[in-house]
Amino acid sequence: GRYVLSMQTDFQHRSPTGDDVIKIGMVDLEDGCKWIELGKSEAWGWQQGCQLQFIPGTDSKVLWNDKEGDNFVCRIMDIKTREMRTIPRAVYALSPDGKWAVTTDYRRVNDTRPGYGYAGIPDPNRDVLAPEDSGIWRINLETGESELIISLAQIAAIPNPLDDYSEAKHWFNHLLYNTDGSRFEFLHRWRFPDSLRNAQYEDVGG
């Protein structure tokens, strides 16, 4: 393609805060690698940026996550017309047909695994080990509607054959669709309040 999506920041060597803004843009490979600014984001991290990407099946529509008030949202822009709309939930992974996304709770990820979530909005379930209203959502990218399809409470209720993790704090991360969009995978992670107990899981299987 002609354009390479990219982000621009004015600092390094520290973690972003909820007030740090990153510039969203693209590099024009057919015009001397000219930088073209498209917008900004207040929902980003060094590990995964703001999930900036082209929507599959189109060469003109891109999306990225941002913060709006007390919510993490997703901006969808047509880079040819600059028309932009917002859907009320940040995305994580897109289906190959570009019609759907799955996502997790970036507030909780930031609390449990700083660097992978987004700073700036605290997790309302910080003290809840496996909340019923947090988990993985499926998002219709055309309408913006979303549905919680599996909660942390549901996943934590599945018995662990190796250990009783009823006292552990649970979260989801690293979502990814398969190649035909019929399924997706995710990591279910948990942490015990006892650091020595957590260490038992750090090198499972070598």
How would you label these PLM feature ranges?
Residues 1, 58-59, 98, 172, ...:
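Conserved loop/turn motif of beta-propeller repeat scaffolds
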Residues 1-4, 62, 101, 184:
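Hydrophobic beta-strand positions that form the internal "hydrophobic ladder"
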Residues 7-21, 104-133, 187-205:
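Short, conserved, GDST-rich strand-edge loop motifs in beta-rich repeat architectures
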Residues 10-11, 17-67:
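Blade-loop segments of beta-propeller domains
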Residues 21-31, 75-79, 131-143, 200-206:
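Beta-propeller blade signature
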Residues 32-37, 81-84, 144-148:
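Predominantly a core beta-strand signature of beta-propeller blades
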Residues 43-135, 148-165:
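Asp-box/WD-like beta-propeller blade repeats and closely related beta-sheet repeat scaffolds
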Residues 163-206:
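Loop-centered beta-sheet repeat module
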